[in-house]
Amino acid sequence: MSIVIGADAAGLRLKEVVKDFLEKENFHLVDVTAEGQDFVDVTLAVAAEVNKEEQNLGIVIDAYGAGPFIVATKIKGMVAAEVSDERSAYMTRGHNNSRMITMGAQLVGDELAKNIAKGFVNGKYDGGRHQIRVDMLNKMG
């Protein structure tokens, strides 16, 4: 499993904080950030890498998280969540089988961003009754 991470200019500093934290937690990180990319390009790059392996997860950071979330939900088969708290990050894995989260550097601080990332990457899909919704989401697009 790889954690694919990317950011636009507004999310660069926080991306480095999250990236360093996850590397210290022994996760394999793939950083697809390229200079000058806007959130659309970054989100598409993260999604492309996430979709290479079923177990890959993605994190996109910009100013507010909304833009990358909108982009991610346009990608067939991608279930994503815009999060700004640890519980939502964890639960979106458990109940929605989300493979990507977005967050805003102007909304969350360093420690909260680390906890959001930790909750997301450590979350496990619960399946069961949640699979009906996930199947519905995966048919959209």
Curated annotation (Swiss-Prot):
EC number(s) given by UniProt: 5.3.1.26
Single Gene Ontology BP annotation: galactose catabolic process
Catalytic reaction annotation: aldehydo-D-galactose 6-phosphate = keto-D-tagatose 6-phosphate
Keywords: Isomerase, Lactose metabolism
Gene3D superfamilies: Sugar-phosphate isomerase, RpiB/LacA/LacB (3.40.1400.10)
Pathway: Carbohydrate metabolism; D-galactose 6-phosphate degradation; D-tagatose 6-phosphate from D-galactose 6-phosphate: step 1/1
Keyword tRNA processing: no
Isomerase listed as a keyword: yes
Gene Ontology molecular function: galactose-6-phosphate isomerase activity; ribose-5-phosphate isomerase activity
Assembly description: Heteromultimeric protein consisting of LacA and LacB.
Family the entry assigns: Belongs to the LacAB/RpiB family.
Protein name: Galactose-6-phosphate isomerase subunit LacA
Organism this protein belongs to: Streptococcus pneumoniae serotype 4 (strain ATCC BAA-334 / TIGR4)
UniProt lineage: Bacteria, Bacillati, Bacillota, Bacilli, Lactobacillales
